Amino acid sequence: MSALDVSVVVPTYNRRAVLARVLDALEHQTLDADRFEVIVVSDGSTDGTDQLLARWATSPRRQAITQANAGPGAARNAGAAAAAGSLLVFVDDDVVPSPDLLVHHLAAHRRAGRSVAGFGPMLKPVDVRQSPWVRWEHATLEKSYDALVSGRWDPSPRLFYSGNASVPASAFAAVGGFDVTRRRAEDTELAYRLADAGLGFTYVHDAVGWHHAERSLASWLAIASAYGGHDVEVVRAGQPWLFDAIIEEYPTRNPVTRAVTQVTVGRSRAVHLTSMALVSLGRLIDRAGGERIARGAFSIVHNIRYYHGVAEALGGRRVFLDTFVPGGRR
């Protein structure tokens, strides 16, 4: 690798307080300071982030870039274009890196023996109380990390989340970076193109980022549907294997999830009313101390909205049922 091994790229939008924690953590990395730089791209922030960055960017190894709001993919591309390091490490503005995060990403690439894209865990901070749907997200991610560590799952493009990820700068440039037309799931879409270019994937278990995530209920609900539509778009863009995977996974879902999906899918009002009823139930159970039980309700909500997004992208309820349900039950 070059003298400057790593360029850390942090896209940010109106998260000034937690961004300050991210920047402080990057100042305390165990990787020698002369081996990496940090580039922060403010994507149209209006909360004082730009002023914070102006005070922070006091050396050549601290770059602050400001741009009109264009989305996280465009912000990451701008940071990558300004980067000098051989390895790009992407860290989101609400992911506080552990002290050894950069050391572990760098070591994983050197161990790989081939060109790879790496991703590390984003874990729930122990000192933060988050909304129950966000805690469900963390619990779901932790299950996937356990499956990777145990060997039940292999690292794959579907698990590549750019909140804590690393890619050789040359490979990133070769595939054209992030698709700036996408505001959701732009990271997995990039990962599919990296895989097509011959990159492998590696899970960097020790490169821990503490994810100070918080999102509104409306945002969480919208994201689930958007991911379903995104997956169909990716299939049509040249990844037919993904559609086979989605179909194969459907029968493995909880029977209750499948039953509710088959009643609601393709019916927007039914999806909305069912989602809100289950969210209310999940909140009630969570407040009563039944967090693990409440996760079941949030899991059903996420899945019915995801499959609704799939159905809408495919052409509606009938197409979905004919494709996913034996006999096309309506």
Region spans (language model):
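A recurrent flexible, glycine/aromatic-enriched loop bordering the glycosyltransferase active site
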Residues: 147-170, 183, 189
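Cell-envelope/extracellular polymer assembly enzymes that use nucleotide-activated donors
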Residues: 4-7, 37, 189
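Conserved donor NDP-sugar-binding/catalytic core segment of glycosyltransferases
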Residues: 100-134, 212
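Short aromatic/hydrophobic "clamp" motif used to bind/position activated sugar donors
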Residues: 88
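Glycine-rich, basic loop-to-helix element that forms the pyrophosphate-binding segment
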Residues: 67-83
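Active-site-adjacent helix/loop segment of glycosyltransferases
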Residues: 208-295
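N-proximal low-complexity "stem/linker" segments adjacent to membrane-targeting elements
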Residues: 1-28
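A conserved acidic beta->alpha catalytic loop
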Residues: 25, 42-51, 69, 92-96
